[in-house]
């Protein structure tokens, strides 16, 4: 978890700490969390914010990795001791991406995937959050997208963006339903049909040509299937115009009626 400072407090000073438990059953005699263990930090003038941590227990060798950071600077990677939860002695952080935040790591079929949230947040329907991905044969990188652009240079293949009257998807999470079946979580900065409130998104996690794709949540209705080989694309140039909305903060109680936002 992250503590104080960083993007949470308006500065660049932050910490990532871990607490470990042998069981999640509160009735077990082994149920007891360790004291907080600091595994990463950032100073006021550092080009990284030590928040937004993500963990990967490598299925190939049992090593434990933690990524962290925000769009204020670099995304960094450190190795932890899976037996103690502490930072591996002498471990030096590695820069693996830039211009994103809230990263997470996945291993699949010989590839390590780094998913990060790109764009701006915290402005309701005007937020531009989207989730991108790069991959590497090594957990330490370099991570590149489908066009060969390095994530250390701002690259990233799109996984999910705004759509269906929801905007600003960010903070990827993985949930394995069964062998070969997985779902992804994110939060949308604004749902236009809920007055611009932030909502949880759950999508099927699909794979296409070796890349993760956010599936659609299909509803009853009539659908049109378009051929990839002969489909058409429409390119638009759009001027940004702010959308007026009432700000709803997730940490405050809000009993106001839910009113859909008007189309822009």
What are these regions (language model features)?
Residues 31-33, 128-130, 167-168, 254, ...:
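Glycine-rich, flexible loop segments associated with nucleotide phosphate handling
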Residues 221-264:
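Lectin-like carbohydrate-binding module/patch detector with strong preference for beta-trefoil
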Residues 42-46, 93-96, 163-164, 225-227, ...:
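Short, solvent-exposed secondary-structure boundary motifs
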Residues 51-54, 101-104, 170-173:
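Beta-propeller and closely related beta-sheet repeat lectin domains
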Residues 152-174:
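Active site of divalent-metal-dependent phosphoester/diester hydrolases
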Residues 1-51, 57-98, 107-112, 117-160, ...:
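Beta-rich carbohydrate-recognition and catalytic domains
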